Amino acid sequence: MARFFQPKKKLQPESKHQQVLVEKLDHQGAGIAYLNKKPLFIDGTLPGEEVVTQLTESKSKFARGKLIKLLKPAAERVEPFCSHFNQCGGCDMQHMDYQAQLAYKQRTLLQLMKKFSGSEILLSPPVTGLEKAYRRRARVSLMWDKKSRQLQFGFRRKQSKQIENVTQCPVLVAELECLLPELKAILSHFHHPEHLGHVELVAADNGAVITLRHTGPLLDEDVAKLRQCAEQHQATLYLMPASDQLERISGEAPYYQEIGFKVPFEPNNFIQVNQKVNQQMVVQALEWLDPQSSDRVLDLFCGLGNFSLPIASKAKSVTGVEGVDDMVQKAALNASLNQINNAQFFHANLEQDFVGQPWASEKFDKILLDPARAGASGIIEQVSALGAKRVVYVSCNPATLARDSQSLLEQGYRLTKLGMLDMFPYTSHLESMALFEK
């Protein structure tokens, strides 16, 4: 049989090891080195570090690498406090000193604002809370592994559908973290674990809340065990057989207190993850907005009334507008519960022109907006038409804040205050607040 020559396969670029110097961090917290003048992004590295990296992706304008060996650590490097760090997709900056994280996030905010809006301003002091045990809500992923016949119970890995099994989480508040091992043990013995979707955990002011999302029927005896667990921990238990269905099995309806106001909510409603930072954020928003007894204030993306209720105690009137009708109804109920009669709430698509809406026919003295990560591009150009002299923009994405600020500046507003809100310590995620004035 003839034998043909076959050259050895060349080593693919993706598998080569390279020694590089990390020069800075990108806006997602990844280290940036340069390889042949091309930026190389390496998760888990810090500026000033010499590392060995394995290329995992190589494009024409950038490359990505995996940290193989740390040759020279940065002074800001610390030992991660969670054994699941690097696997769990939650925290991505536990290897960095906390004060260094704050400085990095503030630099990121300033850089983005300057890049997109051209604005340069001194930052206000950052709003911070607890470094650990700060999360009052979390979603635990569940998946039944048919091969191993084990229930996967934990958090999604970074950029993956795989589950990192956990029974502890140091950034969860203690009353939620202590539930993890017991919930895993109970759910692992359900008769139909393939019907389990996820568990939503929330720490309300009147106790923990456990919500089980399931996609098929559950046996009464299984639900009884879960109910017993909830009652032992003085927690409220909900079942969620569909995304729009909630059934309270035991316990009280949850609520939280916000600077003197009681805010009831359901476990599938959005509330801020970090209670201490949220409280300070509301106080700062009130200080910057400075509502007077003669002011008509507009609260866009008002949710349950996190800002509307406190503003109403100081302003002549508050108009809250939200894109989710269920939240609008709950905000109105929350105002009534707190005996607030100068607030009204409306449902509207805040991605479209709203100036013609009846609630927008009145002029407003001041505006607060707190959009989702996508920002407020659909409505930001309409702000000046409402007549407000002062606008407070609360943002969970500095890139969209910077983008939207361009429009506000073009409408004649000036950026007079800017500050970072550290809602998620030990992650690269940052929130911010900006004040615009005419």
UniProtKB/Swiss-Prot annotation:
One of its GO terms (molecular function) is 4 iron, 4 sulfur cluster binding. InterPro entries: 23S_rRNA_MeTrfase_RlmD, MeTrfase_TrmA_AS, MeTrfase_TrmA_CS, NA-bd_OB-fold, SAM-dependent_MTases_sf, TRAM_dom, U5_MeTrfase_fam. Keywords: 4Fe-4S, Iron, Iron-sulfur, Metal-binding, Methyltransferase, rRNA processing, S-adenosyl-L-methionine, Transferase. [4Fe-4S] cluster binds at C82, C88, C91, C169. It holds the Pfam family TRAM. It catalyses: uridine(1939) in 23S rRNA + S-adenosyl-L-methionine = 5-methyluridine(1939) in 23S rRNA + S-adenosyl-L-homocysteine + H(+). Its EC number is 2.1.1.190. It comes from the Bacteria. Residues 11-69 form the TRAM domain. NCBIfam families: PRK13168.1 (NF009639), rumA (TIGR00479). Catalyzes the formation of 5-methyl-uridine at position 1939 (m5U1939) in 23S rRNA. This is 23S rRNA (uracil(1939)-C(5))-methyltransferase RlmD.
